[in-house]
């Protein structure tokens, strides 16, 4: 199976998330089909970064990871006690200044497929469905001009909003071993 570790340099560093191989790929529509996603372990030990670094999250976030021979699938549930206040900003793809940051509710998943703490690929989406993808080298070099073909869809209801990702393995550089360990960031 695919195993991921958090990429944080503190006590969160060695939290483990396990991805489960699936025979049935989810339909990427932002609606998390229970029959597909129930197989994937729940990742729910998230903390906030603002206003209190590593403080208890003010709203519940849940993530799950599946994979098949060609893709990684990630589901993220963002609970919101005031769903009418979810910020949905339309912008151009990769426009962090306009569609992300504090302007919009958004999530990202990042993979360090070499598990070397030196490179990663980040995939983000805001609550309006606008995408951002970034290649990271080192700790300061973020290349927003890097673009790849991947799919994500969002939906919302009275409990919050949801993101459902489909990312091809062909994007990543990795050694194809039975028990891979990748670095992982979900936020």
Label each PLM-derived region with a short phrase.
Residues 3-187:
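Structural preference for beta-rich elements and adjacent junctions enriched in aromatics
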